[in-house]
A protein has these predicted regions:
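Catalytic-loop of the protein kinase fold
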Residues: 234-251
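A short, aromatic-enriched beta-strand patch in the conserved N-lobe beta-sheet
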Residues: 184-185
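Conserved short submotifs of the Hanks-type protein kinase catalytic core
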Residues: 189-203, 207
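Glycine-rich ATP phosphate-binding loop
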Residues: 132-154
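Activation segment signature within eukaryotic-like protein kinase domains
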Residues: 222-223
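Regulatory alphaC helix of protein kinase catalytic domains
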Residues: 164-169
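Conserved catalytic-loop aspartate of Hanks-type protein kinases
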Residues: 298
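Domain-scale recognition of modular recruitment/scaffold domains used in eukaryotic signaling
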Residues: 1-130, 154
Length: 377
């Protein structure tokens, strides 16, 4: 079936959307008869499928192939997939009798879908549970741009691939100077890749630890710019769920860029029964006790991030294990003391972020406004 796609150049250039999942396809198919061809996972096997909008529903049909190499949906067969689609379009015969779904408009590939040959991986920058991040070169319109490319291993589970694509889908909706920009994704072959702007100074955490002591003006700037990015995400109803200095990247000019949207979601509130792989020392008490994430739990985590900035990148709750920190926060209502180098106005703001009652915590819009005013003084 892969050979069919490689030899069918017209299909490759037009309606073929690779391994783009259902959740990404859905918003592309708006009108009756809109359709794409894509790859999908069925019972552990990668197959070709047709997705079509019909009577407001998104329908999916397997592209079948007989022993002679001919392609078909139900009965009519053609030598190429392109011929099969064109036959259904021109004759107006439905894809299946039961659905009566007809093919009217093929949706051409989106500008954010990139070809693998547009990117050259150079050097590994790091790795995670499901793949690696590479310093890479992105070549388009005879321009070469340094980028970061996040990959997912071929052997990753279907669920891991869907999470990876969800991260890219969330990032595509954002455009802010303090949020990492996504250039596009590569879904036409393995490995799947997310192409992002390069932040050459690495994480804020590593910068703080490499450059002790960072001057107070830069520390305030870090906190202010992080709050700007988070205020923007708040306005987009995005709960990040993993706010920490390690997930803030720095540009060449040391601009803060909020990154790592692997745990993020666009909801008002999230219940997570398992709390797997969550960074305990950055969690709000209601997350620890009730498994709840909300914009206000992000505000709590931001308070811990600001503590990290003024503590020169030390781990929060020094000397305490995760279990000990949890017990002190929840049972004893313990709060860390802000480092003495922090301006009193910043410390007061952080202590408000750590209020037990989420409704008493400030919004990111307010936090950013107050930090920005301090930065001007």
């Amino acid at each position: 079936m892969d050979d069919a796609m490689e030899s069918d150049n017209e299909l490759q250039r037009t309606v073929y959307h690779g391994l783009l999942p259902h959740a990404d396809i859905d918003p592309l198919l708006r009108e009756n008869g809109d359709f794409v061809i894509r790859k999908t996972d069925k019972d552990g096997q990668i197959i070709l499928a047709l997705s079509v909008r019909w009577n407001s529903q998104l329908l999916h049909f397997v592209v079948n192939q007989d022993e002679s190499g001919y392609y078909y949906f139900e009965t009519h067969k053609e030598k190429t997939i392109c011929d099969l689609i064109n036959w259904h379009k021109t004759t107006k015969n439905p894809v299946s009798v039961k659905s009566n779904a007809k093919l009217i408009s093929g949706i051409t590939r989106q500008s954010w879908l990139l070809d693998h040959d547009e990117v050259q991986l150079q050097r590994k920058l790091g790795e995670g549970a499901f793949g690696e991040v590479y310093l890479s070169q992105y070549v388009r319109s005879n321009k070469v741009i340094d980028v970061a490319v996040k990959t997912i291993r071929e052997e990753a589970s279907r669920l891991a691939r869907l999470k990876f694509m969800k991260e890219a889908r969330i990032m595509r909706k954002f455009s802010h100077p303090n949020v990492v920009k996504i250039m596009g994704i590569m879904v036409y072959e393995n490995p799947l890749m997310i192409v992002m702007e390069l932040c050459p100074e690495g994480s804020m955490l590593s910068y703080l630890r490499r450059n002790i002591p960072v001057n107070s003006d830069l520390k305030l700037r870090f906190a202010t710019e992080a709050s700007a990015g988070l205020a923007y995400l708040e306005s987009k109803h995005c709960i990040h769920r993993d706010i920490a200095a390690r997930n803030c990247l720095l540009s060449e000019q040391l601009e803060v860029k909020i990154s790592d949207f692997g745990m993020s979601d666009e909801r008002r509130i999230i219940y997570d029964e398992k709390l797997e792989k969550v960074p305990m020392k950055w969690l709000a008490p209601e997350t620890m006790q009730q498994r709840i994430f909300s914009p206000k739990t992000d505000v709590w985590s931001f308070g811990v991030l600001v503590w990290e900035v003024y503590a020169d990148g030390k781990e929060p709750y020094p000397g305490l294990s995760n279990i000990q920190a949890r017990a002190k926060i929840v049972v004893q209502n313990y709060r860390m003391e802000m480092p003495k180098t922090a301006p009193s106005a910043v410390s007061k703001l952080v202590y408000r972020c750590w209020k037990t009652d989420p409704s008493e915590r400030p919004s990111f819009a307010e936090i950013h406004r107050k930090l920005k005013a301090l930065k001007r003084k």
